[in-house]
Every structure is written in structure tokens, then in C-alpha cells.
């Protein structure tokens, strides 16, 4: 007999679905995959001898530098440490609080995980990504997220209008300055 009796579900949440999500009576274990409309990304280069807290502080600094004062209210997380650059993700803390409020302690449901769409897609495709890297393309209503993985880790991440991703790849190729870029585009 399995001890895992709770129903598990994954819910994909778009910006126009947040209020409906809050009205739902959830049961079981729930993983929320947030649309990249909710997420901001930046690349954090490895820092010799830096602690995890210092790298997180660097990610927060980069978001503040890029987005200004509004970034102060964001929750920031870093991808797992590896040999190369890491991906930092920021999500407005008020959105996360609204999600958590849907799952009171002792209730019939438990919020197991909240993941931005790019990271959920990456985790699902990780085994298909060649060692030399690939472009990861995640298309959502009205926009696309295009990330580049290189042999040395995360190399770039951009949000563009839904139909602009091919131009963005060409622009990245022209700016590469001799750097080897992947040919493979994984549409996730």
C-alpha cells in the first residue's frame, strides 16, 4: 500500500488566472507553475570563493540595477550551483503570498512548489540538452522567453514578443563575437 495517498496536481497559472486560482477549493499536493509573465531573470556569473548568501546578494543587486526600486519587493532564487553561470529568478513577493494564502495550515491542500515556467520547462528537458548547449524557447500568450545554455552554464535569457524570437537568435549570433553558439532550439 502506498503511503502517498494525497492527490497531486500541477497547475499552470497565467496572469489572468490568479483571481480564479484564489477562489478554487484546492485539495491534495499542488505544484504551481507560474507563467513567465510573473518572472524576471538575470544571469549571475560565478564568483570565486563566494558563499551562497553572497551570490544571492549579487543576484538581488543585479535585479535592483536593472529594474530599480520595484525589485525590492521581489523574492529572488538562484538555479543550482554548477561549474558556470547561474540563472536568477525574481517574482513579486505579493504574488507568492497570495498563492501561499490559498493553502492554510491544516487544510485539505498543501502547496508543494512554485516554479517559474522557464525553470519547470528546463527541468523537464534537461536530459535532452546537449553538453555544448542549446536555445530554450518557451512561448506563451503574447510573449516568448528565449534562454541560451552554453557549455559553461546559463549564457543569456530574454523576453520578447511572441513572434520575435527568431530575430533575437539572429541578433545574439551577430553579437557573439566568435563564440560558438548552439544550433539546437528546444521549443518547450
Please report, for each region that a protein language model flagged, where it lies by residue.
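Hydrophobic/aromatic-enriched cytosolic interaction surfaces used to assemble or bind macromolecules
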Residues: 1-188
